[in-house]
Amino acid sequence: MSKLGIDIGNYAVKTSTDDIFESKVTEVKNFGSDSDSIKIGNKTYYLGEGDEEINIVKYEKENFLPLLLGAICRNTDDEIVDLGLGLPVKQFAGLRKNLIEKLQGKEYHVEFTRGNETTKRDITIRSIQTFPEGVTGYLYYAKDIVDQIAGRDVVLVDIGGKTTDIALVQGNKATDPYSINVGTINIYDAIKKSLEMDERFLGKVEIKREKIQDYINKGFYLNGEKQDIKKNIDASISLFKEIYNELKLNYPVSTAAVVVMGGGAKLLGEAFKKNIPGIIVMSDVDKHVFANAKGYKK
């Protein structure tokens, strides 16, 4: 029996074992692909490929079950699993029972393929625990920033794949939840659009969303020369303003500790730091991206 925390976001699936893959599935294998696949019933799904599927209620997405079972198969050989899963703070009270009833006690007969090896699996989800997204990840790493928090209430800003969830955290309790339809995907798309419309690159290069983070981290090269794309990256600032205006109007950002986390923390971190003195940006992608999943397991 294994216990796993699985964070199924709109952009990526993360697990408590430090595994991550894109929240995409397709029934048509891409040429030359070496992606893992999972067969459920008479359908085979290739993980991490295809198009994103966006739904405010994540567990109602058609790709939810292939992503969940795929994450289980990728991370444990055990047949019986206990799972920790998350819901947005605003949905937690109303939907947690539905999520538990959807999965708890269910059995799934699947075939999982990695490379040239295919295994038949009979997976039983013995139990489901649900947790509020963002808050759980923050509490998991709170010990690392306890001196910066200094006993204050916390305004938590969790920038996910397609939404930003905000809540006021007092002790271990979250109140005043609010969700904005701005996330990492929107940020990447804004930068992508700016690059595509830039006359320097027009018609010369194909810009792919999945490469945007590499361009930010490693630079954008054309014909062997590194290009200055600061203004293109700054095209996402208007999205920051949507989040900032909500914080400024409805949360005690001048007296509380403001903590930004999630996949978009690194992307918008500098903009936050310029506008909110003393803000804590949890932007260590290799570490903090797994915060929710690790908190769900704990």
Label for each model-derived stretch:
Residues 204:
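Flexible, glycine/charged-enriched surface loops at secondary-structure junctions
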Residues 156, 163-168, 179:
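Short, acidic (Asp/Glu-rich) active-site segment that either coordinates a divalent metal cofactor
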Residues 193, 197-200:
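Long, charge-rich alpha-helical interaction segments
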Residues 94, 200-201:
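Short amphipathic alpha-helical segments with coiled-coil-like heptad repeat character
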Residues 1-154, 173-186, 207-298:
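Nucleotide/phosphate-binding catalytic cleft detector across ATP-hydrolyzing
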